[in-house]
Amino acid sequence: MNLTFLDFEQPIADLESKINSLVELSQRDKTLNINKEINCLRKKSEDLTKKIFSNLNAWQITKIARHPMRPYALDYIKNIFTDFDELSGDRLYGDDKSIIGGIARLNSRPVMILGHQKGRETKEKIFRNFGMPTPEGYRKALRLMKIADRFNMPLITLIDTPGAYPGIEAEERGQASAIATNLREMSMLKIPIICTVIGEGGSGGALAIGVGDKINMMQYSIYSVISPEGCAAILWKNVDKAPIAAEEMGIIATRLKELNLIDNIIPEPLGGAHRNIKIITSNLKNRILKDLKELDKFTTSDLLNNRYKKLMSYGYN
């Protein structure tokens, strides 16, 4: 398995390099019996990974949330849902590829999926606008929300954005208005809404598809009003202080759960979601199914009342 290691994972990377060298050696020379040594190093690597990941700080978790191999929305859609039919365009200006959405089935049940989509290679990153939606992306999302509401389909959103696109053209086309409209409309949808932060939850760019009955975060995701770098630049005029900002802002799942800003934390495989796509998709699917089962018990009136109470409770610990 080819892994991309972060700076704080370098000791793990060194061990994995030794393991790979021994494995290649044993494959070249079948007379060598070094399985014991390989297994010993694998055990050391696993133990070291557990030790490092049991004591991560907020900045390290931020790096995991941004990991280049971390699963994106389309990865989860492919592995959790069936019969996904993507819907495009806002019917007003254009189609923003940083927001993806459409109708799919979850265990044969029709649902509406919305998510931010980043890219991995340079061309794909540009195509997806680095996961930063424009107003037409949010208006496309709103169009899909209203379709879901009309046909009584639960809405499931997957949040992963550094923030809404800050370019002047986005402002000219009504970025603030598009985000605000989504916040208002999501609060009034008469269907169950389940939102999950799968990577970065950046400010209003995340909130525009993040108002729901259940708000979940993956174990190594982040959710904040501004990026640590942005906060550091404003407070200290120095982006090098981003690690301090990350710690002070309380952007990680455990802290946000303590503040009652999220409902559940979805556990990730050892080393992060990118280490085992099967485990993380299974965990996410199980969480969504549990949430849907719970929300299905409520009448439309109760669903809306509970959502209103949730929104009004924010800011009170």
UniProtKB/Swiss-Prot annotation:
The name under which this protein is listed is Acetyl-coenzyme A carboxylase carboxyl transferase subunit alpha
Which reaction is this enzyme known to catalyze?
A: N(6)-carboxybiotinyl-L-lysyl-[protein] + acetyl-CoA = N(6)-biotinyl-L-lysyl-[protein] + malonyl-CoA
Lineage, top-rank taxon, reads Bacteria
**GO:BP terms for this protein?**
fatty acid biosynthetic process; malonyl-CoA biosynthetic process
Q: Which Pfam families match?
A: ACCA
Gene name linked to the record: accA
Its EC number(s): 2.1.3.15
Which family is it part of?
Belongs to the AccA family.
Protein species of origin? Wigglesworthia glossinidia brevipalpis
What function does this protein fulfil? Component of the acetyl coenzyme A carboxylase (ACC) complex. First, biotin carboxylase catalyzes the carboxylation of biotin on its carrier protein (BCCP) and then the CO(2) group is transferred by the carboxyltransferase to acetyl-CoA to form malonyl-CoA.
Q: Which HAMAP family match?
A: AcetylCoA_CT_alpha
What Gene3D superfamilies does its record include? 2-enoyl-CoA Hydratase, Chain A, domain 1
Q: What class of enzyme is it?
A: transferase
Determine if Transferase is one of this entry's keywords. yes
Q: What metabolic or biological pathway is this protein involved in?
A: Lipid metabolism; malonyl-CoA biosynthesis; malonyl-CoA from acetyl-CoA: step 1/1
Q: Name one GO molecular function term.
A: ATP binding
Occurrences of domain CoA carboxyltransferase C-terminal (ranges): 33-294
Compartments annotated for it: namely: Cytoplasm
